[in-house]
Regions:
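Small/aliphatic-rich secondary-structure junction motif
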Residues: 2-61, 158-220, 238-240, 266, ...
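Short glycine-rich, flexible loops that bind phosphorylated cofactors or substrates
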Residues: 22, 123-124, 249-251
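Short beta-strand elements of ligand-binding domains
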Residues: 117-119, 145-150, 271-275
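Structural beta-alpha unit
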Residues: 1-9, 29, 42, 48-51, ...
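Short, structured interface segments
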Residues: 132-151
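Charged helix-capping and loop-helix junction motifs
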Residues: 130-133, 255-260
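Short, structured coil segments at secondary-structure junctions
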Residues: 133, 141, 212-214, 267-268
Length: 281
């Protein structure tokens, strides 16, 4: 079974906001989850102020007092900017920290079930892995992260694409996708890509229980996994692409597989990354 931390429908959702168009899109998706499932929404705004090294202790104390006076106004500003997109007055959290650290810390501190955040639409060299807060959060989060670029359609989750293999992350992603499909009556397409040299599967990708509980379709294609998944996503135009991911350790830190990383760069529509969780005994 999926680890209890991967709850769907999500009870509590964290929505980081930097007041950008992408953040507004994330707020609109959060509104859907609240109206559809009654999810609690917390909006997080992080700022990271680097003070000049020559500040004296007195100047630092004065600055902190001024910052405290400004906090109430800043909180109200974030609330007023968020309310039109959510349709209600959300819980607001202001944090002085780097955005990625603030998001990861808040998601754990408040026992969140999901993070919904915007992806800025940059491409090419401007969208290198470490250049995106969204990608850094996805890489390090232990929770499912829904990353979006634009506002949701009238029916936000009508078609789901879930690339699937026989690995544990793939199985967990499929189970999470099946939960969503069953809950919102969405069409679920399960895609398996056979790369050159792959051994044939010895068991069905989709179990009987999932087939009986969901509107599910299976597709098998040959080719490079990342490229084929990206092409299928562009052709099928799902409302959300759901992928499992397993972090691997290396000398330079943790990383995702090359397939997962490539899909994150190539994905056009909403992308929901489901991190691998160890199963409870």
């Amino acid at each position: 079974m999926v680890n209890p931390q991967h709850v769907f429908p999500p009870r509590r959702i964290l929505v980081p906001s930097d007041m950008s168009d992408a953040s507004e899109s994330a707020l609109k998706y959060a509104r859907y989850f609240r109206e559809r499932f009654g999810s609690e929404i917390r909006v997080l705004h992080a700022h990271n102020l680097e003070l000049p090294p020559y500040f004296s202790s007195g100047q630092l104390a004065d600055f902190k007092r001024e910052l405290k006076r400004m906090e109430k106004a800043a909180r109200e500003y974030v609330r007023k900017r968020s309310e039109p997109f959510l349709g209600f007055m959300p819980e607001i959290e202001l944090v002085e920290n780097t955005p990625a650290e603030a998001i990861l810390n808040a998601s754990q501190a408040h026992d969140m079930d999901m993070i919904i955040m915007g992806m800025h639409g940059r491409r090419g060299l401007q969208r290198l892995w470490m250049g995106s807060v969204t990608e850094r959060v996805i890489r390090q989060s232990s929770l499912p992260v829904l990353a979006v670029r634009s506002a949701p359609p009238e029916k936000p989750v009508g078609r789901i694409l879930c690339p699937m293999n026989a690995s544990e992350p793939g199985k967990q992603a499929l189970e999470y996708a099946a939960k969503i499909s069953k809950t919102v009556s969405a069409h679920l397409t399960v895609l398996h890509v056979v790369e050159p040299g792959d051994a044939p599967l010895t068991c069905p990708l989709v179990d009987v229980q999932t087939k009986n509980s969901c509107n599910v379709e299976e597709i098998k294609l040959n080719g490079n996994a990342a490229k084929t998944i990206a092409e299928a996503s562009n052709n099928l135009k799902p409302d959300v692409l759901i992928m499992g991911a397993e972090r691997k350790s290396a000398v330079l830190g943790e990383f995702f597989s090359s397939t997962t990383s490539s899909i994150m760069q190539l994905a056009v529509g909403p992308l929901l990354i489901v991190p691998k969780k160890e199963l409870n005994n």
